[in-house]
Amino acid sequence: MASPSICLLAALLALVSWQAIASDPSPLQDFCVADMHSPVLVNGFACLDPKYVNADHFFKAAMLDTPRKTNKVGSNVTLINVMQIPGLNTLGISIARIDYAPLGENPPHTHPRATEILTVLEGTLYVGFVTSNPNNTLFSKVLNKGDVFVFPEGLIHFQFNPNPHQPAVAIAALSSQNPGAITIANAVFGSKPPISDIVLAKAFQVEKGTIDWLQAQFWENNHY
């Protein structure tokens, strides 16, 4: 039988290995600017030859302070990830500006590859996230200018501007160069091809006609 010290060492190695594969890979050099034209397929992007790298690979022009045009649900997400700044490749971070119209929201969604930390720049936001099964506990808070809130990786979360007269603005930092986003309503009712209405009617315990109506709607897909 293995000694307790060997079992402990094996457990620690398993924990370290799990942490290593649960986030973006760490850089092994000063930088690895994404080569968007490389034919090499890797998890992320191949590195551009350093002799072709310049400051513009780490730069994005200012996100203007003027309010952005919002979509049907009253929000506009401006994401800066590795696709906009190639120098973010292997660095495990991205950022987004989110503009909210009065009574606008960033609808329930999840980031499959990132934790998010949100800071309110202007206005007020009601925010929250829901834990996984079986409890599905809602953690929510009303945030004002300067307040910060964290959304754990992979959990469904949302932001809503409760003010009917004033817009709101927030900045979100995400722990991945490419966090991904799954907008829940869009994924369930707007998938291509659509999920069977029989499946959804049973899942939501409603009539098929209700599902057909929901699938016929246009569902916003906030990209970040």
From Swiss-Prot:
SUPFAM superfamilies: RmlC-like cupins (SSF51182). It comes from the Eukaryota. It holds the Pfam family Cupin_1. Keywords: Apoplast, Disulfide bond, Glycoprotein, Manganese, Metal-binding, Secreted, Signal. Mn(2+) binds at residues 109, 111, 116, 157. Disulfide bonds join 32-47. Gene3D superfamilies: Jelly Rolls (2.60.120.10). The keyword Disulfide bond applies. InterPro entries: Cupin_1 (IPR006045), Germin (IPR001929), Germin_Mn-BS (IPR019780), RmlC-like_jellyroll (IPR014710), RmlC_Cupin_sf (IPR011051). The keyword Transmembrane helix does not apply. Glycans are attached at residues 76, 135. PANTHER family: GERMIN-LIKE PROTEIN SUBFAMILY 3 MEMBER 3. Belongs to the germin family. Plays a role in broad-spectrum disease resistance. Probably has no oxalate oxidase activity even if the active site is conserved. Member of the 12 germin-like protein gene cluster located on chromosome 8 in the major-effect quantitative trait loci (QTL) for fungal blast resistance. Partial suppression of the 12 germin-like protein genes increases susceptibility to the fungal pathogens causing rice blast and sheath blight diseases. This is Germin-like protein 8-10. It comes from Oryza sativa subsp. japonica (Rice). The lineage of its organism: Eukaryota, Viridiplantae, Streptophyta, Embryophyta, Tracheophyta. The gene is GLP2.
